[in-house]
Amino acid sequence: MKGTYDVVVVGGGHAGCEAAAASARLGARTALVTQAFATIGSMSCNPAIGGLGKGHLVREIDALDGLMGRVADAAGIQFRVLNRAKGPAVRGPRAQADRKLYRAAMQAEIQAVNGLDVIEGEAEGLCFDGEKIAGVLVGVETLACAAVVLTTGTFLRGLIHIGEKQVRAGRIGEAPAEAMGLALEALGLSMGRLKTGTPARLDGRSIDWSRLERQSGDVEPEPFSFLTEAITRPQVDCFITTTTPETHAVIRENLHYSPVYSGAINGRGPRYCPSIEDKVVRFADREAHQIFLEPEGLDVPTIYPNGISTALPESVQERFLRTIPGLEHVAILQHGYAIEYDYVDPRELTAGLEVKRVPGLFLAGQINGTTGYEEAGAQGLIAGLNAAARAGGLAPITFDRSEAYLGVMIDDLINRGVSEPYRMFTSRAEYRLTLRADNADQRLTGKGMILGCIGQQRAEIFKAKSEALNSARDLLAGLSLSPTEATRHGLKVNRDGVRRTAFDLLALPDVTLETLRSIWPELKTIPETIAAQIEIDAHYAVYLDRQEADIAAFRRDEGLALPTDLDYASMQGLSNEIRGRLAAIRPATLGQAGRIEGMTPTALTLLAARVRRAGAHA
């Protein structure tokens, strides 16, 4: 026997690292099996972490003492909060990362985890004791264990496409996981093929930057991790350019070489991250598509052109790239490609990401039909915790839709399945006013402490912050003004005779804690970090009761019958994607509509309201 562990994690990507670290934090003796230690923490596609919906997941991973947030802070070279002009519930923290720094930081984190061994080799099969998992085959030897987490990414029988050329690989230059794909197939699991793509990597020294629009980060970078005090890396700019009609002409002329349009690829790609070929075909009337030129590091010339992933032949890639402003003389360091890979229907899984028919086998990341580092990391954390719980004879660890975005994601996956790579959006969450990025620690760290997956440093910081928040809330609750007093201080309130606490007043438009400090100087004792949280809590307090009432009404309507002749095309507020699916499937009830892939809680609420109005006027 090569070794005996409680948990063996297969794969050293974003899901695997979180799974291995989470398992070990819960006290399980854990092994991480990867083809090469040097590839742990690699960013296979874009050099960025976070974004809309995704940034929420990173904060939740961090709140449960995961790695991604801290590593992104250590490697971040441009930080921006997306949707800053909108409400706090839909703001998304995002960071460009230096690939080398990210990989190095993740490897350092993995090496520092107590109870975690890294084993280089290829996992080729699974061992069983009856129907239960008993180990993993690594080469000709066995790692005995009580639970296994598979985080195979795009390696599961991966096939790279560049034009008409095909190469069996899990990532460019790395071997695929052929044997494990066959092993899963032998279990009789429902499986399919998906695909994703990546653009060419460009030499920044050959780009005419003077012609491009500059995109800077936030003046004051906002970290992902609740443990990070400040961002210390030098910050860089990104740049924006666009495709041109000439670009589109070159692509159209060569579509027959694209593996998607030639029929060489059968797997579905991510709807919200289409290739440039798909964009040109699907949006034929568009004369330009935006491209973000993102530096891949502080000391390398490599540029990632976000927005033009492609699998066209190398010569065609060179032609269309040089029709783009600023890229007329661009040199290509690595050509773009598409990759097709196996996935397991996530409806095979429990809420703890355990395969229902194979006790002790857990899956996380792209093997479950998702796309994105953040989605993978969040699943890895949950799978790792549950694998450790399984090995220790503990109850499953789950999070529901009202607790976390990671709960929303897993619930979507295991109940709806996927037909295309799943990506997290804020619109998928019914409770997004509660599930904000800013309060992830307040929602999850306490539960993590009870579970035993939170380290001492985070526990102490969380306790101190919670005490400060409670103290600030108590202080605000103890101060109040009558309408007359409020008016005297320049605050606009209803003349209803009701006294309002300082917390109530914070919910008023244009009222901040700084405004109230001019009335009550004692509020100056509230630290700025706590003040920001309190202001957001106060802003949303009045809406949360309304949201809870809306959700209760929505649940009552789940059994509502939908007319067979309902005109979805004329319904305002629905995306074209949802209109198309409703029209094609024609669900009989609101409940059935809710199970359609891609359906959102907001769309269901609109649908229910439309049917109720129609019934009222019948």
Curated annotation (Swiss-Prot):
What are the names of the required cofactors?
FAD
Task: Report residues binding FAD.
Answer: G11, G12, G13, H14, A15, G16
For molecular function, the Gene Ontology terms on record are: flavin adenine dinucleotide binding
Cellular compartments annotated: Cytoplasm
GO process terms (BP): tRNA methylation; tRNA wobble uridine modification
Q: Which domain of life is it from?
A: Bacteria
InterPro entries from the entry? FAD/NAD-bd_sf, GIDA_C_N, MnmG, MnmG-rel, MnmG-rel_CS, MnmG_C, MnmG_C_subdom, MnmG_C_subdom_sf
Q: Which SMART domains match?
A: GIDA_assoc_3 (SM01228)
What does the annotation say about its assembly with partners? Homodimer. Heterotetramer of two MnmE and two MnmG subunits.
PANTHER family attached here?
A: GLUCOSE INHIBITED DIVISION PROTEIN A, PROTEIN MTO1 HOMOLOG, MITOCHONDRIAL
- Functional note: NAD-binding protein involved in the addition of a carboxymethylaminomethyl (cmnm) group at the wobble position (U34) of certain tRNAs, forming tRNA-cmnm(5)s(2)U34.
| UniProt similarity note | Belongs to the MnmG family.
State the protein's name: tRNA uridine 5-carboxymethylaminomethyl modification enzyme MnmG
